[in-house]
Amino acid sequence: MSRRYLLRACEASLRRLGTDYIDLYQVHERDGLTPMEETLDALDTLVRQGKVRYIGCSNHSAWHVMKALGISERRGLQRFVTQQIYYSLLDRDAEYELIPLSIDQGLGVLVWSPLAGGLLSGKYRRNVEPPAGSRQTTPWGEPPVYDRDRMYRIVEALAEVASARGTSPAQTALAYLLGRPAVTSLVIGARTEEQLANNLGCVEWTLDVEERARLDEVSAPLLIYPYWHQANTAPERLSAADEALLRPYH
């Protein structure tokens, strides 16, 4: 993400899009070989030139994001206003650091693969062969599944909640994320018009307290250190950002 690369890439994007500016320009991946200062200075130049309105990042760890925000503050540069992250009912790892960071620093969260690569679509059930041509029959390995029994428990609970409400598992999984703190939008990957229409239906309703509690419980992330210590020793001193992860544990 060198200065030369970013300036040239933005110009090429503007030509392809046939527009004068880009509303949100996000650094898609962390470049550990280019100084963050150089990357942010280039992005700041694009904003000041009027070619970009706002900047964001994607697939950064929390310390990378905070380092970038600190550099922007110290140097008077444009700061990231969004982060695009993987987050789903199946994988709530983002709640350890990335979601609390977004709440604390005022970043909007754009979620990619909110259906966990289709695993939460309702197509994949225990002891049932996946449909021919479905994504999980391809060599693509993201997101990784480390515990298939846990995955099926989540899928089964999701299907039960969806069936009781009369919605699809996919729509229910999307509605779950839309009700999570800091989440501002979902990047969906529907392949058909029918899938798209079904997915978009998630904005028309919200999960009730019991439904959300059921899904929270079955998908709860394991409390790793220092979070179990924080939940046990200082539960009355948690901020809103802390509560995004720790609320159910105290």
Regions found by a protein language model. Name each.
Residues 18-21, 159-175:
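Acyl activation and transfer enzymes in specialized metabolism, enriched
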Residues 184-195:
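Glycine-rich phosphate-binding active-site loops on the catalytic face of alpha/beta enzymes
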Residues 94-133, 168:
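Aromatic-lined glycan-binding groove of carbohydrate-active enzymes
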Residues 49-50, 105, 165:
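Helix C-cap/helix->beta junction micro-motif
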Residues 13, 22, 35, 55, ...:
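Conserved, mostly hydrophobic/aromatic
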Residues 1-93, 97:
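Glycine/proline-rich, positively charged
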Residues 128-160, 164, 179-183, 197-250:
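Terminal-tail/helix-coil boundary detector
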